[in-house]
């Protein structure tokens, strides 16, 4: 269903091997920057920032309900279902709609892995639990879906954005701004620590970029056959 994307001018850019190596090196550099940034934030900024911003948004329960992960996942699933039905009835989708399907599926999968594996592995209590006496520390292999590290919201949003960042280069700046706004809201809303959103954004965007890269390689390979 997604092969029409390969013919779109927006999707050019797998490039020669040199470009792929450059992108890989940029990702490695980003990883090397993010790891110490997460460590420093976890040790020195998470708790002080959480205490400083506590209650700034007042009662954000309605906002939290409206943007709960289950709601966002349901919206993405509904979009995928609608576009699949459209593909069946019309025989094709525009490249942008195909990219949307890929972005939604990548986002859903990345969120599931984060919620069922990464949060369980790291086991960091969320800010609400910390304010009720929990220690802000890693509890390896002792976590649950209610833990906060990495941020599921940022993984969800980052994976969706990462696909479009790879397939539509002009979307990089606006999507980066939106991710930054989302990260700030998650911190100010007492849902996540600084380290949570950094780790979640990196993991999510990485998943999206990888999905876009693999799709481009698959599409270009299919077009040569």
What annotation goes with each model-predicted range?
Residues 2-82, 119-141:
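N-terminal transmembrane-helix/juxtamembrane module of multi-pass inner/ER membrane proteins
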Residues 10-15, 81-93, 165-168, 210-216:
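Structural signal for the C-terminal ends of transmembrane alpha-helices
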Residues 17-25, 29, 135-225:
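Membrane-embedded catalytic cores of phosphoryl/pyrophosphoryl-handling enzymes
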Residues 27-31, 95-103, 197:
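Residue-level signature of transmembrane alpha-helical entry/exit and packing/kink sites
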Residues 36-43, 107-114, 179-191:
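Aromatic-anchored segments of alpha-helical transmembrane domains
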Residues 41, 46, 81-84, 109, ...:
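Alpha-helical membrane-inserting segments
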Residues 47, 51, 88-92, 123-128, ...:
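Transmembrane helix-loop junctions in multipass membrane proteins, especially transporters and channels
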Residues 51, 94-166, 170-171:
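Membrane-interface loops
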